[in-house]
Curated annotation (Swiss-Prot):
Subunit structure of this chain's protein: Part of the 30S ribosomal subunit. Contacts proteins S5 and S12.
Family recorded in the similarity comment: Belongs to the universal ribosomal protein uS8 family.
The name this protein goes by in its record: Small ribosomal subunit protein uS8
Pfam families with a match to the protein in the record: Ribosomal_S8 (PF00410)
Organism: Nocardia farcinica (strain IFM 10152)
Length: 132
């Protein structure tokens, strides 16, 4: 069976592994998922990520991050634009997640950017996910 929304699958794997206090999560690799992981690492939601060569294809391994007393650094993830309903935002109308405490991941013509980076560069695009 084919996967209709690989980004939602990746975000769900992150959410479930984080809720179960796993140290790492594995997902099928793609450039888009690696870019999402790079944004999450840069914003401090995950510890690290790497690509491993498997027998069939590549695997993206994400090391999750927790606080000193095992509190989650990734409180929530929500997929916004879906294959059945795409959501776009102009550069003047970019979404704020929890009043600026969270991050919106936006696919732009300059690549994947956070809402703050997109506003600074003056570009809009497809709103992929909210992370807080």
């Amino acid at each position: 069976m084919t996967m209709t929304d690989p980004i939602a699958d990746f975000l769900t794997r992150l959410r479930n592994a984080n809720s179960a206090y796993h140290d790492q999560v594995k997902a099928p690799h793609s450039k888009l998922k690696a870019n999402i992981a790079e944004i999450l690492k840069r914003e401090g939601y995950i510890a690290d990520y790497r690509t491993e060569d498997a027998q069939v294809g590549k695997t993206l391994v994400v090391d999750l991050k927790y606080g000193p007393s095992r509190e989650r650094s990734l409180a929530g993830v929500r997929r916004v634009s879906k294959p059945g309903l795409r959501v776009y935002a102009k550069s003047t109308n970019l979404p704020k997640v929890l009043g600026g405490l969270g991050v919106a991941i936006i696919s732009t013509s300059q690549g994947l950017l956070t809402d703050k980076q997109a506003a600074k560069q003056g570009v809009g695009g497809e709103v992929l996910a909210y992370v807080w």
